[in-house]
Protein backbone atom coordinates (compact mmCIF):
# COMPACT_ATOMS: atom_id res chain seq x y z
CA UNK A 1 0.00 0.00 0.00
CA UNK A 2 1.40 3.42 -0.96
CA UNK A 3 1.98 6.00 1.79
CA UNK A 4 -0.47 8.95 1.59
CA UNK A 5 1.89 11.40 -0.11
CA UNK A 6 3.05 8.86 -2.71
CA UNK A 7 -0.57 7.92 -3.36
CA UNK A 8 -1.42 11.60 -3.65
CA UNK A 9 1.34 12.28 -6.19
CA UNK A 10 0.11 9.40 -8.38
CA UNK A 11 -3.43 10.75 -8.23
CA UNK A 12 -2.28 14.34 -8.77
CA UNK A 13 -0.34 13.40 -11.87
CA UNK A 14 -3.36 11.52 -13.23
CA UNK A 15 -5.67 14.49 -12.71
CA UNK A 16 -3.30 16.79 -14.56
CA UNK A 17 -3.29 14.27 -17.39
CA UNK A 18 -7.09 14.37 -17.41
CA UNK A 19 -7.19 18.18 -17.42
CA UNK A 20 -4.69 18.41 -20.27
CA UNK A 21 -6.54 15.75 -22.25
CA UNK A 22 -9.87 17.55 -21.83
CA UNK A 23 -8.38 20.93 -22.73
CA UNK A 24 -6.65 19.61 -25.85
CA UNK A 25 -9.95 18.46 -27.38
CA UNK A 26 -12.25 21.24 -26.10
CA UNK A 27 -13.75 23.55 -28.74
CA UNK A 28 -15.64 25.98 -26.48
CA UNK A 29 -13.23 28.89 -25.95
CA UNK A 30 -14.52 29.76 -22.46
CA UNK A 31 -14.25 26.19 -21.20
CA UNK A 32 -10.83 25.72 -22.80
CA UNK A 33 -9.50 28.88 -21.13
CA UNK A 34 -10.83 27.72 -17.76
CA UNK A 35 -9.09 24.35 -18.17
CA UNK A 36 -5.81 26.02 -19.13
CA UNK A 37 -6.09 28.46 -16.24
CA UNK A 38 -6.45 25.80 -13.53
CA UNK A 39 -4.07 23.38 -15.27
CA UNK A 40 -1.07 25.64 -14.64
CA UNK A 41 -2.06 25.99 -10.99
CA UNK A 42 -2.36 22.24 -10.53
CA UNK A 43 1.04 21.74 -12.13
CA UNK A 44 2.57 24.05 -9.56
CA UNK A 45 0.87 22.07 -6.80
CA UNK A 46 2.35 18.86 -8.20
CA UNK A 47 5.79 20.49 -8.27
CA UNK A 48 5.58 21.46 -4.59
CA UNK A 49 4.09 18.15 -3.43
CA UNK A 50 6.83 16.34 -5.36
CA UNK A 51 9.56 18.28 -3.57
CA UNK A 52 7.90 17.52 -0.23
CA UNK A 53 7.70 13.82 -1.16
CA UNK A 54 11.40 13.70 -2.03
CA UNK A 55 12.41 15.73 1.02
CA UNK A 56 10.40 13.73 3.58
CA UNK A 57 10.15 10.26 2.01
CA UNK A 58 13.13 10.07 -0.33
CA UNK A 59 10.88 9.21 -3.28
CA UNK A 60 11.20 10.78 -6.70
CA UNK A 61 7.73 11.62 -8.02
CA UNK A 62 8.97 11.13 -11.59
CA UNK A 63 9.17 7.38 -10.89
CA UNK A 64 5.49 7.34 -9.94
CA UNK A 65 4.17 9.24 -12.97
CA UNK A 66 5.59 7.07 -15.73
CA UNK A 67 7.06 9.94 -17.71
CA UNK A 68 3.66 11.15 -18.93
CA UNK A 69 3.70 14.36 -16.91
CA UNK A 70 6.59 16.77 -16.49
CA UNK A 71 7.15 18.04 -12.96
CA UNK A 72 7.87 21.76 -13.14
CA UNK A 73 6.69 25.07 -11.67
CA UNK A 74 3.45 26.49 -12.98
CA UNK A 75 1.62 29.59 -11.79
CA UNK A 76 3.12 30.15 -8.30
CA UNK A 77 0.76 28.77 -5.67
CA UNK A 78 1.01 31.94 -3.59
CA UNK A 79 -0.46 33.96 -6.47
CA UNK A 80 -3.45 31.63 -6.91
CA UNK A 81 -5.43 32.92 -3.93
CA UNK A 82 -8.14 35.13 -5.44
CA UNK A 83 -11.12 37.12 -4.25
CA UNK A 84 -14.13 34.72 -4.43
CA UNK A 85 -16.05 36.50 -7.19
CA UNK A 86 -12.99 36.24 -9.44
CA UNK A 87 -13.44 32.46 -9.69
CA UNK A 88 -16.84 32.53 -11.42
CA UNK A 89 -17.02 32.06 -15.20
CA UNK A 90 -19.70 32.44 -17.86
CA UNK A 91 -21.73 29.21 -18.09
CA UNK A 92 -22.45 26.99 -21.05
CA UNK A 93 -26.06 26.42 -22.13
CA UNK A 94 -28.16 23.66 -23.68
CA UNK A 95 -26.71 24.39 -27.13
CA UNK A 96 -23.20 23.35 -26.04
CA UNK A 97 -21.79 20.24 -27.69
CA UNK A 98 -22.13 16.93 -25.90
CA UNK A 99 -18.33 16.74 -25.66
CA UNK A 100 -18.22 20.13 -23.90
CA UNK A 101 -20.91 19.02 -21.44
CA UNK A 102 -18.93 15.85 -20.75
CA UNK A 103 -15.71 17.80 -20.25
CA UNK A 104 -17.34 20.19 -17.77
CA UNK A 105 -18.91 17.31 -15.84
CA UNK A 106 -15.67 15.32 -15.74
CA UNK A 107 -13.43 18.15 -14.54
CA UNK A 108 -15.96 19.36 -11.95
CA UNK A 109 -16.10 15.88 -10.40
CA UNK A 110 -12.30 15.51 -10.49
CA UNK A 111 -11.73 18.84 -8.74
CA UNK A 112 -14.46 18.13 -6.18
CA UNK A 113 -12.81 14.83 -5.24
CA UNK A 114 -9.42 16.53 -4.98
CA UNK A 115 -10.75 19.27 -2.73
CA UNK A 116 -12.47 16.71 -0.49
CA UNK A 117 -9.28 14.64 -0.22
CA UNK A 118 -7.13 17.61 0.74
CA UNK A 119 -9.61 18.98 3.25
CA UNK A 120 -10.31 15.60 4.87
CA UNK A 121 -6.76 14.22 4.90
CA UNK A 122 -4.58 17.24 5.60
CA UNK A 123 -5.02 17.02 9.38
CA UNK A 124 -3.62 13.47 9.43
CA UNK A 125 -0.37 14.08 7.56
CA UNK A 126 2.73 13.31 9.64
CA UNK A 127 4.53 16.69 9.53
CA UNK A 128 3.40 20.23 10.25
CA UNK A 129 4.79 21.49 6.93
CA UNK A 130 2.88 18.84 4.99
CA UNK A 131 -0.36 19.64 6.84
CA UNK A 132 0.07 23.33 6.10
CA UNK A 133 0.77 22.67 2.42
CA UNK A 134 -2.35 20.51 2.12
CA UNK A 135 -4.37 23.23 3.85
CA UNK A 136 -3.07 25.99 1.58
CA UNK A 137 -3.69 24.08 -1.63
CA UNK A 138 -7.11 22.89 -0.44
CA UNK A 139 -8.17 26.54 -0.56
CA UNK A 140 -7.10 26.71 -4.21
CA UNK A 141 -8.92 23.48 -5.06
CA UNK A 142 -12.09 24.93 -3.57
CA UNK A 143 -11.66 27.87 -5.95
CA UNK A 144 -11.25 25.45 -8.86
CA UNK A 145 -14.47 23.70 -7.90
CA UNK A 146 -16.26 27.06 -7.93
CA UNK A 147 -14.81 27.86 -11.35
CA UNK A 148 -15.80 24.58 -12.95
CA UNK A 149 -19.22 24.37 -11.34
CA UNK A 150 -19.98 27.87 -12.60
CA UNK A 151 -19.45 26.58 -16.15
CA UNK A 152 -22.45 24.26 -15.77
CA UNK A 153 -25.72 25.21 -17.49
CA UNK A 154 -27.69 27.00 -14.72
CA UNK A 155 -30.98 26.43 -16.57
CA UNK A 156 -30.72 22.64 -16.68
CA UNK A 157 -33.24 20.88 -14.43
CA UNK A 158 -32.16 18.50 -11.70
CA UNK A 159 -33.29 15.47 -13.69
CA UNK A 160 -31.54 16.70 -16.83
CA UNK A 161 -28.39 17.05 -14.77
CA UNK A 162 -28.91 13.57 -13.31
CA UNK A 163 -29.17 12.12 -16.81
CA UNK A 164 -25.96 13.87 -17.90
CA UNK A 165 -24.23 12.80 -14.69
CA UNK A 166 -25.02 9.13 -15.30
CA UNK A 167 -24.10 9.47 -18.97
CA UNK A 168 -20.76 10.95 -17.94
CA UNK A 169 -20.04 8.02 -15.63
CA UNK A 170 -20.88 5.55 -18.39
CA UNK A 171 -18.59 7.43 -20.77
CA UNK A 172 -15.67 7.37 -18.33
CA UNK A 173 -15.98 3.67 -17.52
CA UNK A 174 -16.28 2.90 -21.23
CA UNK A 175 -13.12 4.91 -21.91
CA UNK A 176 -11.25 3.08 -19.13
CA UNK A 177 -12.50 -0.27 -20.46
CA UNK A 178 -11.22 0.42 -23.97
CA UNK A 179 -7.75 1.50 -22.85
CA UNK A 180 -7.15 -1.06 -20.09
CA UNK A 181 -4.57 -3.79 -20.75
CA UNK A 182 -4.81 -5.64 -17.42
CA UNK A 183 -7.54 -8.26 -17.86
CA UNK A 184 -8.71 -8.26 -14.23
CA UNK A 185 -9.00 -4.48 -14.10
CA UNK A 186 -10.64 -4.43 -17.54
CA UNK A 187 -13.33 -6.78 -16.22
CA UNK A 188 -13.85 -4.43 -13.29
CA UNK A 189 -14.35 -1.46 -15.64
CA UNK A 190 -16.83 -3.54 -17.63
CA UNK A 191 -18.76 -4.46 -14.49
CA UNK A 192 -18.95 -0.83 -13.37
CA UNK A 193 -20.03 0.23 -16.86
CA UNK A 194 -22.95 -2.22 -16.74
CA UNK A 195 -23.99 -0.82 -13.36
CA UNK A 196 -23.88 2.76 -14.62
CA UNK A 197 -25.87 1.88 -17.73
CA UNK A 198 -28.58 0.67 -15.36
CA UNK A 199 -28.43 3.99 -13.51
CA UNK A 200 -28.62 5.83 -16.84
CA UNK A 201 -31.78 3.97 -17.82
CA UNK A 202 -33.34 4.85 -14.47
CA UNK A 203 -32.45 8.53 -14.90
CA UNK A 204 -34.07 8.48 -18.35
CA UNK A 205 -37.23 6.96 -16.85
CA UNK A 206 -37.38 9.62 -14.13
CA UNK A 207 -36.93 12.40 -16.70
CA UNK A 208 -39.79 11.05 -18.78
CA UNK A 209 -42.05 10.41 -15.78
CA UNK A 210 -41.66 13.74 -13.98
CA UNK A 211 -40.73 16.19 -16.75
CA UNK A 212 -42.36 14.59 -19.78
CA UNK A 213 -39.04 14.68 -21.64
CA UNK A 214 -37.41 11.98 -23.71
CA UNK A 215 -33.72 11.49 -23.03
CA UNK A 216 -32.98 12.53 -26.63
CA UNK A 217 -34.07 16.08 -25.74
CA UNK A 218 -31.03 16.26 -23.45
CA UNK A 219 -28.67 13.86 -25.25
CA UNK A 220 -29.68 13.98 -28.93
CA UNK A 221 -27.06 11.45 -30.05
CA UNK A 222 -26.84 8.59 -27.58
CA UNK A 223 -23.56 7.37 -29.06
CA UNK A 224 -20.45 8.30 -27.11
CA UNK A 225 -18.10 10.90 -28.57
CA UNK A 226 -14.48 9.82 -29.01
CA UNK A 227 -13.41 8.04 -25.80
CA UNK A 228 -11.10 9.83 -23.38
CA UNK A 229 -7.52 8.71 -23.88
CA UNK A 230 -4.69 9.61 -21.52
CA UNK A 231 -1.11 9.93 -22.71
CA UNK A 232 1.86 12.25 -22.50
CA UNK A 233 0.90 15.89 -21.93
CA UNK A 234 4.41 17.35 -21.75
CA UNK A 235 4.42 19.27 -25.03
CA UNK A 236 0.83 20.44 -24.62
CA UNK A 237 1.46 21.89 -21.17
CA UNK A 238 4.64 23.61 -22.31
CA UNK A 239 2.50 25.42 -24.86
CA UNK A 240 0.20 26.72 -22.11
CA UNK A 241 2.99 27.94 -19.82
CA UNK A 242 3.02 31.37 -21.44
CA UNK A 243 -0.04 32.29 -19.37
CA UNK A 244 1.52 31.78 -15.92
CA UNK A 245 1.38 35.53 -15.25
CA UNK A 246 -2.37 35.67 -15.84
CA UNK A 247 -4.95 35.90 -13.06
CA UNK A 248 -8.73 36.30 -13.04
CA UNK A 249 -10.81 39.44 -12.80
CA UNK A 250 -14.52 38.72 -12.46
CA UNK A 251 -15.45 36.40 -15.36
CA UNK A 252 -12.36 37.26 -17.39
CA UNK A 253 -8.59 36.70 -17.32
CA UNK A 254 -5.95 39.42 -17.20
CA UNK A 255 -2.23 39.81 -16.59
CA UNK A 256 -1.40 40.53 -12.96
CA UNK A 257 0.75 43.46 -14.14
CA UNK A 258 -2.33 45.10 -15.66
CA UNK A 259 -4.29 45.18 -12.39
CA UNK A 260 -4.47 48.47 -10.47
CA UNK A 261 -3.08 48.46 -6.90
CA UNK A 262 -6.65 48.74 -5.60
CA UNK A 263 -7.76 45.50 -7.31
CA UNK A 264 -9.58 42.88 -5.24
CA UNK A 265 -6.80 40.44 -6.13
CA UNK A 266 -4.23 42.43 -4.15
CA UNK A 267 -6.58 43.15 -1.25
CA UNK A 268 -7.30 39.44 -0.92
CA UNK A 269 -3.61 38.55 -1.24
CA UNK A 270 -2.72 40.98 1.54
CA UNK A 271 -5.33 39.36 3.74
CA UNK A 272 -4.50 35.69 3.05
CA UNK A 273 -0.74 36.00 2.52
CA UNK A 274 0.42 39.07 4.45
CA UNK A 275 3.94 37.62 4.78
CA UNK A 276 5.31 35.52 1.91
CA UNK A 277 8.03 34.16 4.18
CA UNK A 278 5.52 31.99 6.07
CA UNK A 279 3.49 30.68 3.10
CA UNK A 280 3.72 26.84 3.15
CA UNK A 281 4.20 26.46 -0.62
CA UNK A 282 7.21 28.79 -0.35
CA UNK A 283 8.58 27.00 2.71
CA UNK A 284 8.56 23.63 0.94
CA UNK A 285 10.76 24.96 -1.87
CA UNK A 286 12.99 26.78 0.61
CA UNK A 287 13.46 23.57 2.60
CA UNK A 288 14.18 21.58 -0.54
CA UNK A 289 16.80 24.08 -1.69
CA UNK A 290 18.52 23.90 1.69
CA UNK A 291 18.48 20.10 1.63
CA UNK A 292 19.41 19.44 -1.99
CA UNK A 293 20.55 22.74 -3.47
CA UNK A 294 18.03 22.64 -6.28
CA UNK A 295 14.24 22.96 -6.70
Across the structure, where does each feature detected by a protein language model lie?
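Non-heme di-metal
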Residues: 1-295
